[in-house]
């Protein structure tokens, strides 16, 4: 039996971009937010839970750096850490997200405590970080390619939220504006790594599965939020109205 023929770089890129059909911009929770149908609680819940993703992105990127022997790749990839953590004496994306939290009426200390993070969101994000630690650096780096679709989702918030949610302080939108440029830059680097590394049919199909894994993570996070904030079925809702779920276990 002959081996399947690898996709050309252009065909492979097209296959990667086609995965955008499953990006979480199409999740009903996101659709409700940018159509102006989300409640204050639903937006606050999204901001609070997404903060857990934000603070873990630098851990994911640090894992990629730790596993990468290529100095030139590390020199460029480290910018992602600085984008989120901030350079010495400068704020980064995490501080910008805390300001978004304040803009929607959340206390920064409550966000930092992560007490509002739903178990389903925590499990999804933790799975992503653990994947980055255990995978080879090329696979972990390529898993970030959901950034191919990120500028569209940031722009949709900037276009629709000020119109639909006048109660949100506009200063909170700084994160989305900043990420528009950063995401486009990151895509160029991540896509170059991916197209160069995956040159066999089997490798390309594996990469498409890895990208789907990342899409599954983002979609599953919103599924958990939908249960809690749209259907009013948070964890243990049938036995208690208290937030009894674990708030994170440090190993």
UniProtKB/Swiss-Prot annotation:
The gene is pqqC. This is Pyrroloquinoline-quinone synthase. It is an enzyme of class 1 (oxidoreductase). It catalyses: 6-(2-amino-2-carboxyethyl)-7,8-dioxo-1,2,3,4,7,8-hexahydroquinoline-2,4-dicarboxylate + 3 O2 = pyrroloquinoline quinone + 2 H2O2 + 2 H2O + H(+). It comes from the Bacteria. It comes from Pseudomonas savastanoi pv. phaseolicola (strain 1448A / Race 6). PANTHER family: 4-AMINOBENZOATE SYNTHASE, PQQC-LIKE PROTEIN. Ring cyclization and eight-electron oxidation of 3a-(2-amino-2-carboxyethyl)-4,5-dioxo-4,5,6,7,8,9-hexahydroquinoline-7,9-dicarboxylic-acid to PQQ. It holds the Pfam family TENA_THI-4. Pathway: Cofactor biosynthesis; pyrroloquinoline quinone biosynthesis. Keywords: Oxidoreductase, PQQ biosynthesis. GO terms for biological process: pyrroloquinoline quinone biosynthetic process; sulfur compound metabolic process. InterPro entries: Haem_Oase-like_multi-hlx, PqqC, PqqC-like, Thiaminase-2/PQQC. The keyword Oxidoreductase applies. GO terms for molecular function: pyrroloquinoline-quinone synthase activity. Belongs to the PqqC family. Its EC number is 1.3.3.11. The keyword Oxidoreductase applies.
